[in-house]
């Protein structure tokens, strides 16, 4: 039996929507948001009405009768650490997301948007494999200072979806494979997947690992400490330098990799330097994850929107293909993964979890 399910994936620079009937896509649309459109909002929660209007416009444009929906699923946001799986959206979850209790990110709006529409229709709302899925081995949590532990915050949904898809193409189970998977998008996360579990991964949100189009990644600690006490920036402004205005925005004033590539191909020295450095840092993180797996790596998988860039992925391949084969799985299977999780629950093949 198949079910009509709306999937909602709010990202830092886009809102992605699709309606599925079973595993068939009835329609899918990605709405891109420019920096100018989002500049008027002081925080993610202020974007709720804007994203809600985007959702309603897309549904109306496709002429889909929302009363046919049997469930709504949103991308999971920053919650307390949880096991992988499909979760019913609860009031406790909504409260934590509205308060940004565990951090602020556009994905926090996924459950809020899903529940608003689902409640209007009196149908269930879910999230699947949120970014806080935590499967890290204990040694990976040790940071180097006893008062700080490393956290698992990454693009779990797309990592898992890409891992399962490639494993299936190789005729094996994801749970029996060792992969290094790199999600390349507005944020970048690189994880060591050992037999179905992401046992080590950089915190792709809060300043850890490679820099990305809009995030700073790891920074020299003492220099950042000096900035914190310089009096030039507030705490919020410093946080924005790490999460929303770091990386390529900091170096080139844009988070559009299409613009960056155009500058690279035009011979812009600053653009070439930043572009090469980002590929270098991703490659270095892939190498580190290969060590976590003790060199027993079945494949390196490059996924996410930036994996569509042949110029960017070629630079990573050149630096990492001595480890093992590099497989490009461009784009994101996140909407499909959200739908699959809910279809399994609605069909009674899997039980939903409670937050």
UniProtKB/Swiss-Prot annotation:
Keywords associated with the record: ATP-binding, Cytoplasm, Kinase, Nucleotide-binding, Transferase
Superkingdom assignment: Bacteria
InterPro entries (alphabetical): Aliphatic_acid_kin_short-chain (IPR000890), Aliphatic_acid_kinase_CS (IPR023865), ATPase_NBD (IPR043129), Butyrate_kin (IPR011245)
Main location: cytoplasm
Subcellular location: Cytoplasm
Catalytic activity: butanoate + ATP = butanoyl phosphate + ADP
Gene Ontology molecular functions: acetate kinase activity; ATP binding; butyrate kinase activity
Pfam family, one: Acetate_kinase
Gene3D superfamilies in UniProt: 3.30.420.40
PROSITE patterns: ACETATE_KINASE_1, ACETATE_KINASE_2
EC annotation from Swiss-Prot or TrEMBL: 2.7.2.7
GO CC aspect terms: cytoplasm
One example of a Gene Ontology biological process annotation: acetate metabolic process
PANTHER family per record: ACETATE KINASE, BUTYRATE KINASE 2-RELATED
Family the UniProt entry places it in: Belongs to the acetokinase family.
HAMAP family with a match to the protein in the record: Butyrate_kinase (MF_00542)
Protein name: Probable butyrate kinase
Gene: buk
């Amino acid at each position: 039996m198949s079910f009509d399910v709306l999937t909602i994936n709010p990202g830092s620079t886009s809102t992605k929507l699709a309606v599925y009937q079973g595993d068939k896509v009835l329609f899918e649309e990605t709405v891109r948001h420019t920096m100018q459109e989002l500049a008027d909002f002081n925080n993610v929660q202020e974007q709720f009405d804007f994203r809600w209007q985007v959702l309603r416009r897309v549904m109306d444009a496709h002429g889909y009768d929302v009363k046919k929906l049997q469930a709504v699923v949103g991308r999971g946001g920053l919650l307390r650490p949880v096991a992988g799986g499909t979760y019913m959206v609860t009031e406790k979850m909504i409260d934590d997301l509205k308060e940004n209790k565990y951090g602020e990110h556009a994905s926090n709006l996924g459950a809020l948007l899903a529940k608003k529409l689902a409640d209007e229709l009196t149908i269930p709302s879910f999230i699947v494999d949120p970014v806080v899925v935590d499967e890290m081995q204990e040694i990976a949590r040790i940071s180097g200072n006893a008062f700080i532990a490393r956290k698992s915050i990454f693009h779990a949904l797309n990592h898992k979806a890409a891992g399962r898809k490639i494993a299936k193409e190789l005729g094996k189970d994801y749970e029996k494979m060792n992969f290094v998977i790199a999600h390349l998008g507005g944020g970048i996360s690189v994880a060591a997947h050992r037999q179905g579990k992401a046992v080590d991964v950089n915190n792709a949100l809060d300043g850890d690992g490679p820099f990305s189009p809009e995030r700073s990644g790891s920074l020299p600690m003492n220099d950042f400490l000096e900035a914190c006490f310089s009096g030039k920036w507030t705490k919020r402004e410093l946080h924005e330098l790490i999460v929303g205005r770091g990386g390529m925005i900091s170096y080139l004033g844009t988070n559009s990799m299409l613009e960056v590539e155009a500058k690279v191909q035009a011979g812009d020295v600053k653009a070439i330097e930043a572009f090469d450095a980002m590929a270098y840092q991703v490659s270095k993180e892939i190498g580190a994850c290969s060590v976590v797996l003790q060199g027993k790596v079945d494949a390196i998988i490059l996924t996410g929107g930036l994996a569509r860039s042949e110029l960017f992925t070629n630079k990573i391949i050149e630096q990492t293909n001595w480890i093992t084969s590099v497989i490009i799985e461009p784009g994101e299977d996140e909407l499909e993964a959200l739908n699959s999780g809910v279809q399994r629950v609605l069909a009674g093949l899997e039980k939903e979890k409670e937050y």
